[in-house]
């Protein structure tokens, strides 16, 4: 039953994305998909979260943190701040609740996109069928960036949990998942600024 559901799902997304997957390098195709997904998530956040209230909460919490830091050396003032700290904890809880609201609607589509990208760019996936010599590398990062992003650690971690499939060909190489995550963080940050999301 689930096999036929996923077949329909894959065929539907293939109809949408296969033209760019066949023509573009995997790095560019995944970047485009990450931009589309980030745009959808950020628009959902913009529509579902009261941005004015988020800004108010963040400002009040930040002001308290500055005050707390200044008065941390004075025990008398710290007692006074204890009461305010309770209120700030409630504001933090409200802020967290607001930030989780869009996740309720976007979590499932994100998981489905990961499943689709694995179907296309994973070991034995569609892209490897189209390009049999492909080794699974989507992009090679500059050495300094691979050190900053701890690529060696992620390769090691992946080797523990994922047996078989593509082999690690370089300490600077990223596969589809690493590249998608990197693109997603970058595009989401830019889109949040453009859309004025706090």
UniProtKB/Swiss-Prot annotation:
Coiled-coil ranges per UniProt: none
InterPro entries: EMC3/TMCO1 (IPR002809), MJ0935 (IPR038978)
Keywords: Cell membrane, Membrane, Transmembrane, Transmembrane helix
Topology of this chain in the membrane: Multi-pass membrane protein
Residues spanning the membrane: 23-43, 107-127, 137-157, 168-188
Primary location class: membrane
Entry GO CC: plasma membrane
rRNA-binding listed as a keyword: no
Subcellular location: Cell membrane
A single MF term (Gene Ontology): small molecule binding
Protein name: Uncharacterized protein MJ0480
Annotated organism of origin: Methanocaldococcus jannaschii (strain ATCC 43067 / DSM 2661 / JAL-1 / JCM 10045 / NBRC 100440)
Lineage, uppermost ranks: Archaea, Methanobacteriati, Methanobacteriota, Methanomada group, Methanococci
């Amino acid at each position: 039953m689930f096999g036929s559901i996923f077949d329909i799902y894959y065929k539907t997304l293939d109809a949408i994305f296969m033209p760019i997957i066949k023509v573009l390098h995997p790095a560019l195709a995944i970047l485009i998909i990450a931009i589309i997904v980030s745009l959808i998530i950020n628009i959902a956040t913009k529509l579902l979260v009261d941005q004015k209230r988020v800004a108010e909460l963040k400002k009040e919490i930040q002001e308290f943190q500055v005050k707390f830091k200044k008065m941390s050396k004075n025990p008398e003032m710290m007692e006074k701040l204890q009461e305010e700290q309770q209120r700030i904890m409630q504001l933090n809880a409200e802020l967290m609740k607001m930030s989780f609201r869009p996740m309720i609607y976007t979590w499932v589509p994100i998981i489905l996109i990961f499943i689709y990208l694995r179907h296309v760019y994973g070991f034995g996936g569609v892209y490897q069928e189209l390009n049999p010599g492909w080794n699974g590398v989507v992009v090679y990062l500059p050495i300094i960036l691979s050190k900053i992003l701890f690529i060696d650690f992620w390769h090691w971690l992946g080797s523990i949990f994922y047996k078989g499939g593509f082999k690690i060909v370089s300490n600077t190489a990223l596969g589809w998942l690493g590249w998608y995550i990197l693109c997603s963080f970058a595009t989401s940050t830019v889109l949040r600024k453009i859309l004025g999301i706090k």
